[in-house]
């Protein structure tokens, strides 16, 4: 596999030595900048695009949406810190991980209908070591995707899911179908 890290933030640019600080791009041009950053490639080449912010952050959602629409990803990984209840500096509560996955996939499918969420990466520093595995398994069952703490166990399970290369995993196909809402 050939892979290129596409940095979109200042820290990523320092690590990679190149990239595009997407938060410095005028909002109207964010999607176009993201598209330039991640051109079409051969099937055996992966662009790993550094994500920014969240669709749920009142100050940075436009950056996230532009990056999501412009890069037109085939797969996304949702990242979260266990115990975080709101975005820094905001009183708006964070959504449940399932809602977060559903919203990011729905918005991403506007420009790539085949988009799927391949996993959740959690920072579990607040979870006792003896409870970590059970916690990750519970989140995986609830979200129906692979769940790891890459800081503890590495990202191999997420990479394995990416390598499966299926157009739509069964869990994502079920999630994509309209679901009845309950009160």
Model-identified regions with their sequence ranges:
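Flexible phosphate-sensing "switch/lid" loops adjacent to ATP/NTP-binding sites
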Residues: 1-183
């Amino acid at each position: 596999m050939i892979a290129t890290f596409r940095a979109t933030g200042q820290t990523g640019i320092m690590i990679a030595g190149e990239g595009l600080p997407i938060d410095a791009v005028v909002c109207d041009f964010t999607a176009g900048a993201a598209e330039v950053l991640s051109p079409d490639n051969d099937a055996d080449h992966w662009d790993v695009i550094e994500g920014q912010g969240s669709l749920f952050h009142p100050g940075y959602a436009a950056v996230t949406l532009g990056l999501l629409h412009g890069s037109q990803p085939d797969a996304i990984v949702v990242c979260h810190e266990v115990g975080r209840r709101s975005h820094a500096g905001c009183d708006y509560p964070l959504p449940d991980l399932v809602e977060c996955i559903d919203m990011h996939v729905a918005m991403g499918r506007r420009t790539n209908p085949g988009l799927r969420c391949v996993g959740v990466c959690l920072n579990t520093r607040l979870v006792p070591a003896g409870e970590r595995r059970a916690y990750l398994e519970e989140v995986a069952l609830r979200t129906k995707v692979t769940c790891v703490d890459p800081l503890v166990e590495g990202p191999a399970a997420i990479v394995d899911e990416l390598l499966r290369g299926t157009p739509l995993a069964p869990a994502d196909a079920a999630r994509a179908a309209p679901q009845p809402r309950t009160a």
